[in-house]
Every structure is written in C-alpha cells, then in structure tokens.
Amino acid sequence: TETRPVFHKGQHHLVALLQVSGRDKCYLFRLNKMGVPSCIIHLLEDTTVPKIGLSLGDDMNMLHHRVKFSPGRFIDLQKMVSDFGIKDLSLQKLYANIFHERISKREQLSNWESDQLNPKQQLYAATDAWTCINLYETLTELRQTGDYELVKTDEEDQHV
C-alpha cells in the first residue's frame, strides 16, 4: 500500500493506493479515488491466494481504517527473512543484499493522493509490489535448498 506522507504531528491519511502484483503484471488501485470495491475485499480475505508484503501489520492497520475485512493468507517478508538471520528488514536493503541490485525508494514520500500518478510513481509502486514477490520466491527456494550463507560485513549488513 501507499499512503500520502505525513509531515505534521497528529496528521494522518488513509491508504491511497493498493498494489496487486503477479510475476508479469501489477495493478494499481487508487483507493482514494474509487473506494474499496467488494472484489478487493474478497481478495484480501481469500485464504487460497497468498498476499506477500513487507511490514504487513502496518498495511493491515492502515487498510482497516478504510474498510473492515478479515485478512486471509498474508505472508510478511520481515518474518520470513528473520529465519535466515537477516536483521536489516527494509525492502531496499533486502533486495540489494539478496540480488546485488539497487531499487529506488525516491518516490515513496510523494503525494499518493494527487489527481494523476506520474510515471515515476507508477513504476515505484509496481516495483515495490513485484520486488516482494521476487524476494518471496527466491527466499522460498533458498530455504528449500539450503544454498545460502549469511555473511556479516564491517557495516553489519547481512548478505545472503
């Protein structure tokens, strides 16, 4: 999910964007424009379809301010990577440590409630969702094969 950033104490905003991604496509739902349709609620509650993300507790709390639902089969990558002994739980660091590639988080603090999302926001939101799937699949494979080694560097980063 993406929410308009807060810059003043006591201010809060509702979730503006929900990303739903597969391996090849990502759909961006502008919840601030369309509300939460019943098909999205059904997806959120579906226990057969895994929903993968990072720090999902925060997302669940924010989504519940918009609509009440019973979460079904959510997989939080933060819990998964802790099984590997990885301590830095940010998406950017996880992706860099596992894939040795960098992803930009520059658009994270942009206005997700704007009339139109610009191409950079769209790319950021889609990448954010797709990255979680990619990490999940890779970590699942590594867990099954045991083909990884945790390496600590001088910076205390953990690399798989």
Place the predicted regions along the sequence by residue.
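Conserved DEDDh/DEDDy metal-dependent 3′-5′ exonuclease domain
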Residues: 3-141
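Acidic two-metal-ion nuclease catalytic site recognized across multiple nuclease folds
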Residues: 133-160
